[in-house]
Amino acid sequence: MTAPTPTPANAATPYGTLPPASPLPQRRPVSLPRLAQMREAGEKITMLTAYDATFAAVADAAGVECLLVGDSLGMVCQGLPSTVGVSLDTMAYHTASVARGLHRVQGTAWLIADLPYGSYAEGPEQAMRSACTLMQAGAHMVKLEGGGWTAPTVRFLVERGVPVCAHLGLTPQTVHALGGYRVQGRSDEAARALRSQANELQDAGAAMLVLEMVPATLAREVTDALPRCHTIGIGAGSGTAGQVLVLHDMLGVNLGKNPKFAHDFMAQAGSVRGAIEAYVQAVKAGRFPDDALHAW
């Protein structure tokens, strides 16, 4: 059987004339040195969650620097009440899916995967085994939640070649201990503790730090105090080195009410890629988040 001849550009088709193909822009793969250069230049880092190959490819094409395979997939994909029920096998499955999506389009995004609940609490050795599972699935970095008690684990992983993103403030894996989804670090004592924990994690080698639902002033202070650790805010104001949102929240397709810190970029975009591009542009230009609307 003879293969069909590809339709050339500018040829007439039943649907109109095909436009000439535009060359894909040449982009360098995102790396830790590249993220450091961006921060030094004052350019905001953009991050979104991704859970499958197609959305990963679209987000990468829209210019997102970092993709997070978050255990939030338990809530937005599996319908679980929290992230606690997400397994390591599930995280590896979705990480591999996202990695394949990036590979198919020669994507450049930096890929981070969450270490799920129960996969690192026993100590550094357990964390290393779990991290190896996610790195072998295609992750470039792993993320774990928790304060100073995780610092020895962070150091252990970094010394063995595993880049680590830490996570302070509201830590969804321990939401039951925190009494619900509440802003963290509001009291003077809590703010001091968060600053101290952030310094510990930077000293242990964490290259990135997610700050979730933390007062904007505190998040800015922490960011200024961490020259070697890039802060990524979600509900933490505009003063962090970058921003992250759950993909479903920024597309307005979650199962409940959109959180205060999110914005529905799909409402005016008309397409998924357009919405993600609008998010990237808004973060880069300093229009999102608006501290008066999206922060505490």
Swiss-Prot record:
GO terms for cellular component: cytoplasm. Its cofactor is Mg(2+). Residues 1-29 are annotated as: Disordered. Mg(2+) binds at D71, D114, E145. GO terms for biological process: pantothenate biosynthetic process. Catalyzes the reversible reaction in which hydroxymethyl group from 5,10-methylenetetrahydrofolate is transferred onto alpha-ketoisovalerate to form ketopantoate. Its main location: cytoplasm. It is an enzyme of class 2 (transferase). This is 3-methyl-2-oxobutanoate hydroxymethyltransferase. It is found in: Cytoplasm. The keyword 4Fe-4S does not apply. Transmembrane segments: none annotated. It comes from Paracidovorax citrulli (strain AAC00-1) (Acidovorax citrulli). Its EC number is 2.1.2.11. Homodecamer; pentamer of dimers. The keyword Protein biosynthesis does not apply. CDD domains: KPHMT-like.
